[in-house]
Amino acid sequence: MASAEIIAVGTELLLGQIVNSNAAFISQELAADGIYVYHHTVVGDNPTRLKEVIEIAEKRSDILIFTGGLGPTEDDITKQILADHLQKQLVEDEYHMNKINEYFASRNRTMTENNKLQAVIIKDSVVLNNDYGFAAGMYLKENNHTYVLLPGPPSEMKPMFTKYANPLLLSENGNQNILESKIMRFFGIGESQLAADLNDLIVNQVNPTIATYAGDNEVVVRITATAKTKEEASSLVKDTEEEILRRDGTFLYGYGEVSLPELVTAMLLEKELTISAAESFTAGLFQAEIARFPGISKIFKGGMVTYSEETKQSILQVSPQVIKEKGVVSAECAKEMAENVSRLCKTDIGISFTGVAGPDSLEGHPAGTIWIGLSVKGHETEAFQFVYGRDRNHNRRRAVKQGFQLIKQFLDAN
């Protein structure tokens, strides 16, 4: 089985100015191909150190995948150093050169000479077209190694890898069996707890394999099976999926790449249920999230951010008595906020968020104490309490996702 190493080139990565998300993406894709990634390497824009990294990687990996260093500036050195190492010439790729010329001509701008560097490739390499930029990618086999050169910006790298590089890698190095994969998404359970629940499956895994990943306030489980036929592979995945659901199915919210907010929004659109939101400590995060999706104007009528007691009373019409006797961090306040925003915006559903974002306490409640109110036409209004940690922004984001989960649970049950 072929082994791969991902080499990210860029001093900005070493300085922590940019997160190396490219390596995570490529590793996940290669895992699905049956190509094992054993090393991630990050090296700055230094010719000597990059050459050292290449020499080390060749001793331990069959496939070397580079990201970054293909641009027009002096510190973009990846292809120059690799070409020198392989004793290969650099030549101009006509397609990318024409693309660069046409770009500047169409804007009536003079092209600087260094822009031509983006169209330069290592001789004898397969050119990987850049559909979203100018820097050409490369795929090259030499001395029993495969070299893949990809641009650094994820918006250029991901489509180039998916459309051009990965099919070549898969055809030449991938698992010859049929590979089937399924992604399960969980909310409301931590990665450590989920991993503990599935520990015997993970420890004894052979085929399928199970991997857990911590996402943004969620946990992702990836099941991957290989077999001679698609039917066999699918059956292996299904058996494992059913066992996982038996243990932790109550926390599952969906499959694949669809996020919880996206899934809930689609459900609301399908059911043609309108929604509004009243937010205190989340300060509009829920509304900003739901507004990201196309067609949302059909169901999202609006909302209110009422951060202070005064605006809760004057704008959202929360009872002064409730605030005085129960406080803003209470089930009663959350219920009134949800009911009133639904009434004022004339929607089927009203959701509210009130609580203590942190790090300080409020009204005697510790940081991370939150209430979410849910008012649905024809149903009794409910309020749900959750207690998180002291991280202010983490609490706000988690509460928003929790709100979407509560809506999903209602829609699933009704």
Swiss-Prot record:
Q: Which SUPFAM superfamilies match?
A: CinA-like, Molybdenum cofactor biosynthesis proteins
One Pfam match: CinA_KH
Which Gene3D superfamilies does UniProt cross-reference here?
3.30.70.2860, CinA-like (3.90.950.20), MoaB/Mog-like domain (3.40.980.10)
**Entry superkingdom:** Bacteria
Q: What family is it from?
A: Belongs to the CinA family.
Q: Per its record, how is this protein called by name?
A: Putative competence-damage inducible protein
**What's the source species for this entry?**
Listeria monocytogenes serovar 1/2a (strain ATCC BAA-679 / EGD-e)
